[in-house]
């Protein structure tokens, strides 16, 4: 009466209308059965008495699945390697003896990671444009040939020695886009009281950081001084600018992999061991982190199963994930998930197709 059985030779069968059909894998069998049943061993004598049907199943469905955890994973990352990883026999960075290469894109499930924090950033190149990556996300920098572009880069701490990470646009999109940088149409006065820096306009004053004051001075703002009492007598007035508030230490390839975290902010991940080269067409080159089995994923726009080898399979609904036994094991934004190669959709209609 078991919906899924395994022969003494290891062949899986799934019951369809009282007929046992050979099936490619447990994922296909569970989808057909509509429940997260475990395969029960069936003896040869019982198998010989059973009605047998044609082989069915989805050939590229995940071979093994992780049971649903109490709390979904929420710390996936999409990364770029900045340099070739040195080969080591004790701690290879991928299976099969192949090493992670410079500029490879790697998607990782729950890696050890650190946010860029308030003091670190990354400079990236993508499709002829430079971007600043911070712990909050990404913002485009003004063109390098413009006055604003030169002023912003100098104040941020960008120079000829700063490493620019070359990002494909799909990986760039995994970082949350921040409001664009902008200077006031008419530069305000930059006032130094000795205790702080202020932007003064006819409407009033707004506080500045030293980095912002340097940028405004670089585009022609007049610099002057005043006493704290003179500033205190002026009204607060919003200033139409959006400029970085501080300079940064910029990431180099020696610092680790530069990554987009689950929430879209910048992060750093140490070079990871055991990543696997991805098969099929995808932006990502490698994947790692699901050694316990494939997981059900909620992308916020739909459901998928990601296999231990990094293939993503579309799933119709949460009920299918429950039937697979994974439930929602991870919450991963589509911007990261889409970097992986797409496998066959996991649904009952596809699973019931007779294989040739």
Q: What are the functions of these language-model segments?
A:
Residues 1-356:
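Short, surface-exposed polybasic-aromatic patches that bind anionic ligands, especially phosphate groups
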């Amino acid at each position: 009466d078991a919906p899924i059985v395994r022969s003494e030779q290891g062949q899986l069968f799934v019951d369809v209308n009282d007929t046992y059909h050979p099936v490619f894998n447990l994922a296909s069998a569970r989808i057909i059965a509509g429940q997260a049943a475990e395969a029960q061993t069936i003896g040869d004598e019982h198998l010989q008495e059973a009605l047998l049907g044609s082989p069915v199943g989805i050939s590229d469905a995940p071979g093994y699945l992780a049971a649903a955890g109490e709390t979904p994973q929420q710390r996936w990352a999409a990364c770029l390697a900045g340099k070739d990883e040195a080969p080591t026999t004790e701690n290879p960075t991928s299976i099969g003896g192949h090493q992670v290469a410079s500029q490879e894109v790697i998607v990782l499930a729950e890696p050890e990671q650190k946010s860029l924090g308030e003091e670190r950033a990354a400079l990236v190149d993508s499709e002829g444009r430079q971007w600043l990556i911070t712990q909050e996300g990404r913002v485009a920098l003004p063109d390098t040939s413009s006055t604003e572009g030169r002023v912003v880069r100098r104040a941020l701490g960008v120079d000829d020695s700063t490493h620019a990470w070359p990002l494909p646009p799909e990986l760039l999109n995994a970082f949350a886009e921040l409001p664009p940088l902008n200077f006031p149409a008419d530069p305000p006065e930059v006032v130094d009281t000795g205790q702080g820096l202020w932007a003064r306009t006819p409407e009033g004053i707004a506080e500045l950081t030293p980095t912002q004051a340097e940028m405004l001075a670089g585009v022609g703002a007049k610099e002057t001084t005043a006493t704290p009492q003179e500033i205190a007598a002026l009204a607060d007035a919003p200033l139409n600018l959006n400029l970085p508030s501080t300079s940064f230490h910029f990431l180099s390839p020696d610092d680790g992999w530069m990554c987009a975290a689950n929430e879209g902010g910048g992060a750093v991940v140490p070079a990871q061991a055991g990543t696997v080269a991805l098969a099929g067409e995808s932006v990502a080159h490698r994947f790692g982190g699901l050694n316990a089995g494939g997981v059900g994923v909620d992308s916020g726009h739909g459901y998928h199963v990601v296999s231990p080898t990094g293939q993503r399979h579309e799933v119709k609904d949460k009920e299918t994930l429950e039937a697979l036994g994974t439930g929602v094991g991870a919450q991963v934004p589509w911007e990261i998930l889409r970097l992986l190669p797409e496998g066959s959709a996991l649904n009952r209609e596809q699973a019931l197709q007779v294989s040739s």
